[in-house]
Amino acid sequence: MSSVMIKLALPCLFLLALSSALAEPAQVRLWPQGAPGARGDSDKDQPFLLVWPAPKDKANGAAFVVCPGGGYGGLAADHEGTQVARWLNGRGVSAFVLHYRLGTSGYHFPIQLLDVQRAIRHVRAGAKQYDIDPGRIGIMGFSAGGHLTSMAATMFDEKPEGMTHDEVDQVSARPDVAAPTYPVISMTEGFGHKGSRKNLLGPADTDELARHVSTELRVTEKTPPVFIFHTDEDTVVPAENPVAFYLACRRHGVPAEMHIYRPGPHGVGLFLGDPVLGSWSRHLDDWLRNQGFYKPVKRAALSGRLSVNGTPVSWGSVIFTPEDPAAPLACARVMHGNFKLDEKSGPVQGRVRLTVSYSAADVPGLETVDGTVTTQEQKPGAGAWSLEIKGGDKLNLEISR
């Protein structure tokens, strides 16, 4: 990522939004002097961001560009834009809802790639003004916006026709994480979405161009970590789309997590009213936390042993919970009393609380409903169990019952 930081000429309205956290977002055009290839000066011709700064009492420095769906023919800007921005704000994340140009307005590929790259570059270049970390900028999109998200995650090095090559365009367009949500992925397979292909490619549509924008074919080892949500009952954009993208990530060693729920039609958004389907956003929340997206931290490698009454446990787990709720958790699997975590998956350095689980069979005469014992105390009445993690620790965890 480029270290270039650029002082942007931001509209007064946006500056006011930053200082007073207005309820309504500021609208910021991606090219204040006019977008390349634009046919007019209206909002449908000039792509823009709706800026939702995180509340100052919650802001953690992370940001997301949000791409509503609509088959590249419209924008579901409320439930796949505004509602998502508010959800992100609730987690301390600044949100930038992208209104990109559409095929129904006469704009076809590579215009949409140009717009999403510029959006990421704009946010990164203005990190100081937006009070965000240029190394924690994610992208999330829904349906066709999910396809645009996947293009941003796989084609960030591509230089589409129309780049202005100004200072903003010198900044990296690579997102740090990507969350394509019930996404269109393939433009060539039978499970692709024909309407999105028609609107995206327009009269220049060829099989070669369709393969070029089929993002399951564009994944490389440089693709950022990916979180995917979809439903099995989606008949508009079948689940084969995200599965193809997930498998491509696996082949290239890209960290990826996918959740496919059985019930649910296409286009559900956050769907927080459904206690089951709406839980997908909680998984995203956990994933972002454990990616270190909410708070960059130094993690530590460690190893150790876990015993109960002097006897190594047969199996179990140790969860390390940091004091900062935005910092990632760590969980070590215990087998035959031993556990080990490398620096990539270990706990954050500093004070952590321990939650230990083990087999009830390891304590003679002890029975529980599920055969498992979970405790946050080293011994009865001792209070919460905590310790200081420095790195390279060799822990000897002894539980007394």
PLM features: what roles do these ranges have?
Residues 24-58, 192, 296:
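N-terminal cap/lid segment of alpha/beta-hydrolase-fold proteins
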Residues 52, 229, 239, 243-297:
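C-terminal catalytic histidine-bearing segment of alpha/beta-hydrolase fold enzymes
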Residues 68-73, 232:
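Active-site glycine-rich loops that stabilize anionic/oxyanionic intermediates
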Residues 76-78, 82-83, 97-134, 272-278:
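Catalytic nucleophile-loop/oxyanion-hole region of alpha/beta-hydrolase
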Residues 118-196, 210-211, 215:
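Primarily recognizes the serine-hydrolase "nucleophile elbow" in alpha/beta-hydrolase
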Residues 295-401:
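Glycine/proline-rich low-complexity segments that form flexible loops, beta-turns, and polyproline
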